[in-house]
UniProtKB/Swiss-Prot annotation:
PROSITE patterns: FKBP_PPIASE. GO terms for molecular function: peptidyl-prolyl cis-trans isomerase activity; protein folding chaperone; ribosome binding. GO terms for biological process: 'de novo' cotranslational protein folding; cell division; chaperone-mediated protein folding; protein transport; protein unfolding. The gene is tig. It is found in: Cytoplasm. This is Trigger factor.
Amino acid sequence: MQVSVETTQGLERRLTISVPAEQIEKAVTDSLKNEAKRARIPGFRPGKVPVSVINKRYGKAIRQDITGEVMQRNFIEAIIAEKLNPAGAPTFVAGDTDTENFNFVATFEIYPEVELTGLDAITVEQPTSEVTDADVDTMIETLRKQHATFEAVERESVVGDKAKINFVGSIDGEEFEGGKAEDFELELGSGRMIPGFESGVEGHKAGEEFDIEVTFPEDYHAENLKGKVANFVITLNEVLAANLPEVNDEFAKLFGVTDGGLEALKAEIRKNMGRELEQALKANVKEQVLNGLLEQNNIELPKPLIDGEVEVLRKQAMQRFGDQAANMPELPADLFTEQAERRVKVGLLLGEVIKTNELKAEDDRVQSLIASMASAYEDPSEVVAYYNGNEEMLQNMRNVALEEQAVEALLKTAKLTEKAVNFEEFMNKATQQG
């Protein structure tokens, strides 16, 4: 086998490979003979079909299969010999074949050589926070609202009430699509509607009809409504006031806490909030580290890796639509390209961090991650057993652990400062960004 390597552009490589033609001819002949022994063709006894008949019927397909196998086998031998690391499947083009040699060209992209730079220039502002009694009380209030019951009242509506309304919206006297509803239930103060709508409903009683004027935000999702001033004619059908449950041991039972009452519920809430805070703090630091790593290291990315990541993201996006996905057109690749490029780049850079630091997933860390994740379920031990009994799930957790270790390795050389943050503000921001 003779091999020549050519760098065409960037990460693309072209191998021109020449192998003895007899490799193909012998394999084709052997395959034709074997097929002749197996073939059942009318007019011939089993095992007695002439090779010439088999060649006439199946020769072209057999030769194509053999040629493909020869190209694949010799390509693998060539990249091993030339120490090349393909980032995707090659494209084969069969060349001229003379009496002695079969020539073909394999074109593919390789992984880039990654040399990490600027690791000591990465800056990280590490947030610190804790769950306070006030934070637990705020969560208790949220849970009370989630378990509220509502009853009709004969008074003016206020924030926290639910208002059942009919409304008709118009712009310059013309109704617009989506601007009309009947018996629409709106929680005042929820922020579901555009600015000014909910506050315009406040202070009115059931049975009243009134107009409000609001302006659609400039970033509103409907292009034809952005920045437009609209008038809404509203009929308030019913005002429903919230009845919040009392915070006591009976309240705790609503959440399955039967032993320890209210104090046990608060302890469980604090534990869950603490776990979520820890995860959010780690995610924040990780994001800063990765952003710094990307800023300091610019590498060329193989297109096959980007294309593969686009398909993963596209599939995940379609799954979120559930049963509706079957009737949807394929989402364009452009929607995912930027995110795919980032993920590929992060993967390559972290791979080099792992290689440079000779990192291996720590078993204790893997089990700790599984236990932390399982603690959010009703039966944590069952979840832990499931993960440890499923090699694919276990490998995913090893990858998470290894990524954590790589981030920690980068933190050792990064410029690190601490900043105390308010729990509620930090978690709200983390939720919006997530």
